[in-house]
Each structure stands twice: as structure tokens, then as C-alpha cells.
Amino acid sequence: MSRYRGPRFKKIRRLGALPGLTNKSPRAIRDLRNQSRSEYRIRLEEKQKLRFHYGLTEKQLINYVQIARKAKGSTGKVLLQLLEMRLDNILFRLGMASTIPAARQLVNHRHVLVNGRLVDRPSYRCKPRDIIMPKNTTKSGVLVQNSLELFTGKELANHLNLFSTPYKGLVNKIVDTNWIGLKINELLVVEYYSRQA
């Protein structure tokens, strides 16, 4: 199953607000209370929210769930931490890109340095004390500056620091899962995959 490139509003109307997918919002959200929703549908919708918000393929999400199962702690919380510490998501949270697909494109087009080294993998797992900055070219700087101008006034995640001259982001610590701005029940996602196995 490939990455979703279709109409984004369709997914937002179905699943609710997904800030990583698009920064637009639908005019009116349908009332789904009259429809009966099976337990399977509820779990599937939670999984789809996670998948579309972070821009993952089904196979990538399965791999992250398997890694989270092997780690110590709550599988759901570890899964969210793994997804939040991806490079494309960190760029989105810092405001260097307006959406996660835009951040993914920045990384793929080789505009981003992590600790002074060029990284072209959006799935790169950032660690505490990583320094993320645009490449030392005018094009890279302009792309990041335009996104940061749109980002002004929004709250920065508590596990990140942003320095304005030169544009540079610092990962302070592993993300606290209570801070994630997405209404999701991660346990239902883990449950969905445990029933699939």
C-alpha cells in the first residue's frame, strides 16, 4: 500500500482534524452520532488517523508497532514517541515546514542538516541533543524562513527549542505523549494490530 496522495479534505471529514496532513480545516464536520459504529470500525479509524497524520504507509506503521512492542513500557506510548521523534515530524513541530508532507519534501530534497551532516531520510529517528538546521544555501534558508513566518504565534513543543539566528532547532528530550496535538487513542491502534496477527 503506497503513501496517500489523494484529496485531503475527504480524510479530514472522515477522521477529524489531522494537523500533520493539512493546515486547512473543513467548513462543517458531519455528525456521525446517528451511525452505528462497530468496534472494528473504531479501531480502524484510530489506526487511519495515525497513518494519515504522520504520512506513513501501512508497512511502515506495522514496523513501528513491532518495534514498540519489543520496547519497555506501554506499547501505545512508545509507538507515539517513535512517530513523534521522526525527522519529518520534528521539522513540522519546529515550524520549519507547514505540514508533514512538506517536511518530508524538504528532507528528500536534501535541505536539512542534523548535527552538521546531510540527512535525506524523513524516517530518521532524532535523539535528544540533536541539532536540526537548513543547509547553508539561500534556497534552503528561504524555504525554512517562509514556513517559520507562517508558524509565528503557535506554541512550540516542550521537548524542542528553536533559535532564530541562524535558524536552528534543538531536540531537548524524548517527547511527552500528553503534549501531542492529535486526538487519538493509541491503545486502539495497538489492539487493531494485535487482532490482525
Swiss-Prot record:
Answer whether the UniProt record assigns the keyword Nucleus to this protein.
no
Cellular component per GO, a single term: plastid
Q: Which domain of life is it from?
A: Eukaryota
GO molecular function: any one? structural constituent of ribosome
Q: Which UniProt keywords apply?
A: Plastid, Ribonucleoprotein, Ribosomal protein, RNA-binding, rRNA-binding
**HAMAP family according to UniProt:** Ribosomal_uS4_B
Spell out the protein name for this chain.
Small ribosomal subunit protein uS4c
Which lineage do the record's taxonomy fields give for this organism?
Eukaryota, Viridiplantae, Streptophyta, Embryophyta, Tracheophyta
